[in-house]
């Protein structure tokens, strides 16, 4: 399996609606809401390919982006004010892909909604996903062989 490092989609750690609250309300797109003003930079959570750019805020999701990652996971970024990537574009973790906003018919204020979807199409809790990803990264680092990390010097 391919290991892909994930990072949060914006600099703020302040959230106002978590995955459990979305599920309890019966949200069709559960995820995590980051409190941030309109115009805040939104970053790609991981390397991948942009597979959806929806610039028409015609429904509850508003202006949105979806990225498919090499491990089969997808990240969705909703309620954006501006998209800064194109469908089919390759992105790297940390690239600015959009600006946050308050678009969509169900939005109550400016924020960034992040959904994470596994390779089977199931929504997963972004907080738990980030925690699991950090643990996997540490485990991989701990099992790295010294030969792979130590430079070779000639006598």
Regions inferred by a protein language model and the residue ranges of each:
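Residue-level preference for alpha-helix termini and adjacent loops
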Residues: 31-33, 82, 128
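Low-complexity, Gly/Ser/Thr/Pro-rich intrinsically disordered linker/tail segments
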Residues: 143-155
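Conserved, short, structured surface segments that act as functional micro-motifs
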Residues: 63-69, 89-146
């Amino acid at each position: 399996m391919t290991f892909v490092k994930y990072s949060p989609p914006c600099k703020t750690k302040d959230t106002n609606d978590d995955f459990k609250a979305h599920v309890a309300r019966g949200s069709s797109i559960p995820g995590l809401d980051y409190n941030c003003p309109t115009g805040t930079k939104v970053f790609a959570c991981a390397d991948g390919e942009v597979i959806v750019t929806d610039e028409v805020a015609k429904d509850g999701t508003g202006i949105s982006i979806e990225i498919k990652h090499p491990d089969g996971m997808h990240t969705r970024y909703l309620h954006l004010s501006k998209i800064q990537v194109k469908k089919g574009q390759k992105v790297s973790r940390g690239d600015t892909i959009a600006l946050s906003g308050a678009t969509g018919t169900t939005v109550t204020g400016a924020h960034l909604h992040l959904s994470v979807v596994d390779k089977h199409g199931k929504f997963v809790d972004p907080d738990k996903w980030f925690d699991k990803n950090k643990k996997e990264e540490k485990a991989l680092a701990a099992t790295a062989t010294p030969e792979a990390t130590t430079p070779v010097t000639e006598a």
